[in-house]
Amino acid sequence: MNIIKGNIASPLGFSADGLHAGFKKKKLDFGWIVSEVPANVAGVFTTNKVIAAPLKLTKNSIEKSGKMQAIVVNSGIANSCTGKQGEKDAFKMQQLAANKLQIQPEYVGVASTGVIGKVMPMSILKNGFSKLVKNGNADDFAKAILTTDTHTKTCVVNEEFGSDTVTMAGVAKGSGMIHPNLATMLAFITCDANISSQTLQQALKDVVEVTFNQITVDGDTSTNDMVLVMSNGCTNNNEIKKDSEDYYKFKQMLLYIMTDLAKSIARDGEGASKLIEVTVKGAKESSAARMIAKSVVGSSLVKTAIFGEDPNWGRIIAAAGYAKTYFDINQVDIFIGRIPVLIRSSPVKYDKEEIQEIMSAEEISIQLDLHQGNCEGQAWGCDLSYDYVKINALYTT
């Protein structure tokens, strides 16, 4: 697998555009991804009981056909908790895209991110569509989907499948309200491989479980979380069948892109100064390891300790202890970076200057070994700073 420079339109047969429509004052806020041909599609959506209108519509469209040819996204207004009007507006958004591209409406996915409770202004939406072009600036799409993010999040890879080169690209947004169970967290992945919708859905489901579902910034799950994967078959490779060697290679591509995007989201948490990576090994089951890792990285006390550059392993073991899974508390090792701070649940003396150097870094690695099995899991998050409170206190309602 090769990591390459590119954007969401790097796979064969895809194009994209992003622009300023007027949902925000100045920044780019509207864009789309378009495939030359209908692509097979897979999706996972928020587990929040309050589901935004665009998600409902997109999910229903996917269930009808398993195909998608375009994804249109606005940022600044979430179109969530907007009642019947919100459903009409999401449908209108789908219709306008379909009419402009001359494709079936159910082949258009719609997504929105921003302030909850505001109705979609149709004049701004129509203005956006009047300026969108099929082969526009694909790099601008990554900018157009952002809200409180500080930078774009893109990853592109390719891999040889026999004599064919398959390319996969991913783009995401997310900075706050991040605690997906698949903030707003949106991710879109394009690929030119020949793979069925059913096989694609299984691959996405498996990989989401160990990537996007393992990040947390603030413990809030958005009403608009969505991950979509489109694969249009333009490479003309032999169809990737489930459980084949090619399927394993395809999943590795998906895993790399989604891990990279997940870590980028965690690193870009609102007000964050440090990325936290927690690895739990020696568990009886991978699900238990992931649960403990996410419990640790989601702890407000762990987050504030990391912000204060304090190697407070007591907060780490406490957060592990309230994860909803069993482990033997007397057998745990904890490492912060390369330094052991707890061995078999007994404190270890460490060099304060050495550990202070580790705590001052922009990326903090925490490892727990449960000594109960051979399974492991990871989770990612960020520290909790004064700026997080400031950003969200000032965010519009």
UniProtKB/Swiss-Prot annotation:
Gene of this entry: argJ
Coiled coil, from the record: none
GO MF annotations in UniProt: glutamate N-acetyltransferase activity; L-glutamate N-acetyltransferase activity
Superkingdom of the organism of origin: Bacteria
SUPFAM superfamilies per UniProt: DmpA/ArgJ-like
Pathway per the UniProt entry: Amino-acid biosynthesis; L-arginine biosynthesis; L-ornithine and N-acetyl-L-glutamate from L-glutamate and N(2)-acetyl-L-ornithine (cyclic): step 1/1; Amino-acid biosynthesis; L-arginine biosynthesis; N(2)-acetyl-L-ornithine from L-glutamate: step 1/4
GO terms under cellular component: cytoplasm
Organism: Staphylococcus epidermidis (strain ATCC 35984 / DSM 28319 / BCRC 17069 / CCUG 31568 / BM 3577 / RP62A)
Protein name: Arginine biosynthesis bifunctional protein ArgJ
UniProt similarity note: Belongs to the ArgJ family.
Assembly with partners or alone: Heterotetramer of two alpha and two beta chains.
Residues that hold substrate according to the record: T147, K173, T184, E270, N392, T397
